A protein has these predicted regions:
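Short, conserved active-site loop motifs that form the nucleotide-linked donor/cofactor pocket
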Residues: 106, 132-133, 160, 192, ...
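Core SAM-dependent methyltransferase catalytic element
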Residues: 244-273
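A short, conserved alpha-helix within the catalytic core of class I
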Residues: 143-148, 170-184
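Short "lid" loop at the C-terminus of a central beta-strand within the Rossmann-like core
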Residues: 167-170, 199-203
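Short alpha-helix
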Residues: 222-245
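Rossmann-like AdoMet
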Residues: 1-138, 143-144, 148-156, 185, ...
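Short, glycine-/aromatic-enriched active-site segment of Class I SAM-dependent methyltransferases
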Residues: 205-220
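Conserved beta-strand signature within the Rossmann-like core of class I S-adenosyl-L-methionine
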Residues: 160-164, 180-199
Length: 273
């Protein structure tokens, strides 16, 4: 999310107009997921962060699995429209792939404000013939712009699932993330859903404080940790789906053993009444 293009990165082997000399969250996250769209500065930052919390890559992959589970569950609830904000660099099990595997007519809009994600957006636009996908170059901090730009693809008179997967941590408290979420929800009708995952301040707190300290030193983007109570506030006024806001491996796991997967992220799904 919210990447800023810097000087040309050609000297580091990166695409033009993308500065690969400084770690960027999308590429660092890609490294944790086992991807290849990352550069030496990203790998160094990722490894230093993992020194603070060695299970970080497992936690990142658990977040990706949480995305797939929530999208499958929402499709099972009849949701056919998804607005995925802060989508990051495409890997496997992208939102439209999961949704359209269940309902081919699903419509998905991705939004991110990151030149490296934009460079890879083609792989997010491979919709089934019955459905549709679109990609918006837009920042979460501009919810009105996102809603306006999504309207040609999504029918905002019908329920929409708003997906905020590991993105709200880049919105500082003074930027009023709760107001951003509320504005997005105000634009969609009853029966819509909100999906949130967020790194925790109150799971393995000492390790997470050190992790955030390192990431804030090494990356352009700043990271804010939040408690379970703070993450739950994003769902104010919504009906939380069982089991509520929990560690993401504990949200409707595919098998009981998955509950033990290391993760320091809270996650939940709420329905607009």
């Amino acid at each position: 999310m919210s990447g800023d293009s810097g000087s040309a990165g050609a000297g580091n082997g990166g695409p033009p107009d993308i500065d690969t000399s400084v770690a960027h969250v999308a590429r660092v996250y890609n490294y944790w997921l086992g991807g290849t769209t990352n550069y030496p500065a990203d790998r160094q930052a990722a490894q230093q962060a993992m020194a603070a919390y060695p299970d970080l890559a497992l936690s990142a992959r658990a977040n990706r699995a949480f995305l797939a589970r929530t999208v499958r569950w929402l499709a099972g609830q009849g949701i056919r429209q998804f607005l995925d904000i802060g989508t990051g660099i495409p890997v496997n099990n992208n939102t439209h792939e999961v949704a359209q595997a269940i309902a081919a007519d699903s419509r998905v809009v991705y939004a991110d404000h990151d030149p490296i994600v934009l460079a890879h957006a083609r792989s997010l636009l491979t919709s089934s013939p019955e459905g549709a996908t679109d990609y918006l170059d837009a920042d979460l901090r501009e919810p009105g712009k996102i809603i306006t730009a999504a309207a040609p693809t999504l029918d905002l008179g019908r329920p929409v699932a708003i997906v905020l997967m590991a993105v709200l941590q880049f919105v500082m408290d003074e930027e009023r993330p709760g107001d951003i979420v509320a504005e997005l929800l105000d634009a969609v009708p009853s029966g819509s859903y909100l999906v949130v995952s967020h790194p925790a301040s109150d799971i393995d707190a000492a390790s997470m404080r050190e992790l955030a300290k390192r990431l804030n030193r090494l990356m352009v983007q700043r990271v804010a940790l939040r408690s379970r109570a703070e993450v739950t506030q994003f769902f104010d006024g919504l009906e939380l789906a069982d089991p509520g806001v929990v560690r993401i491996p504990e949200w409707r796991p595919d098998s009981p053993a998955d509950r033990g997967i290391p993760s320091t992220m809270w996650g939940g799904v709420g329905r607009k009444r």
